[in-house]
UniProtKB/Swiss-Prot annotation:
Name the UniProt record assigns to this protein: Nuclear transcription factor Y subunit C-2
Organism encoding this protein: Oryza sativa subsp. japonica
Any one GO cellular component localisation term in the record: cytoplasm
Expression triggers: Circadian-regulation under long day (LD) conditions. Expression increases at the end of the dark period, peaks in the beginning of the light period and gradually decreases during daytime.
Family affiliation: Belongs to the NFYC/HAP5 subunit family.
Region described as Disordered: spans on this chain: 1-35, 205-246
GO biological process, one term: flower development
Keyword Transcription regulation: yes
Amino acid sequence: MDNQQLPYAGQPAAAGAGAPVPGVPGAGGPPAVPHHHLLQQQQAQLQAFWAYQRQEAERASASDFKNHQLPLARIKKIMKADEDVRMISAEAPVLFAKACELFILELTIRSWLHAEENKRRTLQRNDVAAAIARTDVFDFLVDIVPREEAKEEPGSALGFAAGGPAGAVGAAGPAAGLPYYYPPMGQPAPMMPAWHVPAWDPAWQQGAAPDVDQGAAGSFSEEGQQGFAGHGGAAASFPPAPPSSE
């Protein structure tokens, strides 16, 4: 039974479909199937699957339910995990086992169709996640089997793709290409250090000439600090040199 060709499996390619076309370069394989034709083929395979399962269920006898693909004890234990469940009949785990088997088969077929779309012969986790996202009845599994995020290419953290020209910013934008150039939230961005203008020595002011206006000197100190800290503010003349100690 396991080695038989199932009626809903993919049909082999017709003879001569992969024959090379003379005079057409690169036409050695079969032509690409349009997207709407591919969807029709997938829908036909799913319909054939359920038609075959219906026929198997109608032809099933009592002896067929003695052999199970899934352990009934495990299914019964899961059913008893619900506090509202008191008693379980002998037929209930059998029906649950068959329902779980159909669920696994349909999800596998839908995942395999996604793998074939991507020209792969290996079923991957992303195929299962894509099949869940495409099917409305499987939406309860979206959070359980999330789709894998695209892996970062080498050099994407520096703002350019691997193999690209130096200094070329990635097309994903600054948020995706330059994640390390932004400080964490709540911390100020690094700035260029401003020139520090030290306060005048009180001894200079005490020994200054009596004709020097102290208020003007204080206002000059404030204007000078603002001009230096602003990087390009109005230029101010330097104050007179301190008096000589001689």
